[in-house]
């Protein structure tokens, strides 16, 4: 498929630069994946669209303050490092800028030597393997020296780090937030549970794929960067029980979707406890095996994320919805508004 089939016009002023004061006050577009019908709501209205017996699947990964600013020990030149994933011990796959200045053996110092990194090799797609040395606890030092790795299209400074974390973030390891979950408050999750909606938690650590645009004209030629996922057998049992009893599995975000679909693809359509690395790439023609609905933000033109959403709800339906979102001035991307996509999505409980 031609990548231009997933393009749309997006005025720059619709890219949300800061989160709203209250998470649940963002807008919600409800899209029926069968008919293409659209409703305009607020995120707190999601209560009306989820039924007793349904299950929300949430990614409880926690974002690291993964962006570090350091200097080369030999020249004092400024180097920016973005941690992507931990390999063995204190060795990490990273992105560095400017990459041409960081060769094998280069030593980078952060926080006046509180943290040091030595380049021990190259990684996929221009990355670098850095081995860190320090005294103390790595994540405590990272918390002190690091910055939240906001996407490049967000120019504003984030005053409160917690606004780039979900309220249920638990397992540290991501280089970006699973942004669909940013709309939920503890109170809203409690109301959903009181209604009989179940909550299930998985982990997928968001990595390089989030930062890499598709660089091929034919989307089939694009290769996703692998990301680590984990789902417990207890969670799998809960999800299978939901299915048996006629409930819907609603994933919160593309990361939860990729986790469940990876597991179902690798286990003959069944959900079971599993851990591993996924590079699954979903675009129109992909047959979904695990999920019945999806909550997600509005994504970049020509991105793998809009391709995933198009695979689930149909490219024409999705592009029509996106053009409607532009017309209605929805806020886009990480701090933007949300969509709920499902079959018969407009059929709310009376």
From Swiss-Prot:
Biological role stated in the UniProt entry: Transfers and isomerizes the ribose moiety from AdoMet to the 7-aminomethyl group of 7-deazaguanine (preQ1-tRNA) to give epoxyqueuosine (oQ-tRNA).
Similarity comment: family membership: Belongs to the QueA family.
Protein EC: 2.4.99.17
Localisation: Cytoplasm
Residue ranges of the TM segments: none
Gene responsible for this protein: queA
One GO CC term, this protein: cytoplasm
Pathway(s) annotated for this protein in UniProt: tRNA modification; tRNA-queuosine biosynthesis
Pfam families the record matches: Queuosine_synth (PF02547)
SUPFAM superfamilies xref list: QueA-like
Main location: cytoplasm
Organism: Bacillus cytotoxicus (strain DSM 22905 / CIP 110041 / 391-98 / NVH 391-98)
NCBIfam families, A to Z: PRK00147.1, queA
Catalytic activity: 7-aminomethyl-7-carbaguanosine(34) in tRNA + S-adenosyl-L-methionine = epoxyqueuosine(34) in tRNA + adenine + L-methionine + 2 H(+)
Gene Ontology BP terms: queuosine biosynthetic process; tRNA wobble guanine modification
Coiled-coil regions, chain positions: none
Molecular-function GO terms, alphabetical: S-adenosylmethionine:tRNA ribosyltransferase-isomerase activity
Protein's name according to its UniProt entry: S-adenosylmethionine:tRNA ribosyltransferase-isomerase
S-adenosyl-L-methionine as UniProt keyword: yes
Record's subunit section: Monomer.
Keyword list, A-Z: Cytoplasm, Queuosine biosynthesis, S-adenosyl-L-methionine, Transferase
